[in-house]
């Protein structure tokens, strides 16, 4: 059975020409056809940017609320006090606290995907940098997770906000949905992310900014996107 599945996957993967770029709509269709794993694969994008990643003023970091969500169930923890505690809970936060939440995190209990904090609680959150930082959970105003509007931040996280940043090679990796999404939904999610990354272009960046766009499913082949079909 396994050999049969492998052969089928190979046949599907052969549909993808490695040296060809595809219009976005065609790339998404191919990815869905090639994704034959027994689980609902994620669909990921890799965006190679024409920046000097060694320079801090060209590093890109941000967040996009995908119009159709990411397909993930997101658990949100919020550092808040006063009225913001109830606001966070009403917006759907899973965990809300301050010193008690900090103690929980220091004890290794990190059962959440996003951490949001109000500015005045950063005196507590700042001490957790060595724990939250390596996990990509440290609140940051650049991605809207340090904010006075905790209700909106929680709702955004729950509705499918994705965070992104350039790696050391100037590449952004991000998930835009799941294989079971409608093709149109994946296309709109991709374009929402791409538009935000375009807006974030550093003034110091020279030459072609969006150098290469690649889509893939968790277990599938990478498919290069024709940049002219997405206004890149």
Curated annotation (Swiss-Prot):
What GO CC terms are in its UniProt record? cytosolic large ribosomal subunit
Q: Which GO terms describe its molecular function?
A: rRNA binding; structural constituent of ribosome; tRNA binding
Top-rank lineage group of the source organism: Bacteria
Q: Which CDD domains match?
A: Ribosomal_L1
Q: Which SUPFAM superfamilies match?
A: Ribosomal protein L1
GO BP terms, alphabetized: regulation of translation; translation
The record's section on Gene3D superfamilies has: 3.30.190.20, 3.40.50.790
Record keywords: Repressor, Ribonucleoprotein, Ribosomal protein, RNA-binding, rRNA-binding, Translation regulation, tRNA-binding
Describe its function: Binds directly to 23S rRNA. The L1 stalk is quite mobile in the ribosome, and is involved in E site tRNA release. Protein L1 is also a translational repressor protein, it controls the translation of the L11 operon by binding to its mRNA.
Complexes and interactors: Part of the 50S ribosomal subunit.
Which family is this sequence assigned to? Belongs to the universal ribosomal protein uL1 family.
- Name of protein: Large ribosomal subunit protein uL1
Taxonomy, top ranks, is: Bacteria, Pseudomonadati, Pseudomonadota, Gammaproteobacteria, Legionellales
């Amino acid at each position: 059975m396994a050999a049969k599945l492998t052969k089928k996957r190979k046949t599907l993967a052969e549909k993808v020409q490695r040296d060809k770029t595809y219009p976005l709509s065609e790339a998404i269709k191919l990815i869905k056809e090639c994704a034959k794993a027994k689980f609902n694969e994620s669909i990921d994008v890799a965006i190679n940017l024409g920046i000097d990643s060694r320079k801090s003023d060209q590093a890109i970091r941000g967040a996009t609320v995908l119009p159709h969500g990411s397909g993930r169930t997101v658990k949100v923890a919020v550092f808040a006090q006063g009225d913001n505690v109830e606001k966070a809970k009403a917006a759907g936060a899973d965990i809300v606290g301050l010193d008690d939440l900090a103690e929980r995190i220091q004890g290794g209990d990190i059962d959440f995907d996003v951490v949001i904090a109000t500015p005045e609680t950063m005196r507590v959150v700042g001490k957790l940098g060595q724990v939250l930082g390596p996990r990509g959970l440290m609140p940051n105003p650049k991605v809207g997770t340090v904010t006075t509007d905790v209700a909106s931040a929680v709702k955004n996280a729950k509705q499918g906000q994705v965070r992104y940043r350039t790696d050391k090679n100037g590449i952004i990796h991000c998930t835009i949905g799941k294989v079971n999404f409608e093709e149109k939904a994946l296309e709109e999610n991709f374009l929402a992310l791409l538009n935000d990354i375009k807006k974030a272009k550093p003034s110091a960046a020279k030459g072609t900014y969006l150098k290469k766009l690649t889509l893939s499913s968790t277990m599938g082949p990478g498919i290069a996107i024709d940049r002219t079909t997405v206004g890149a």
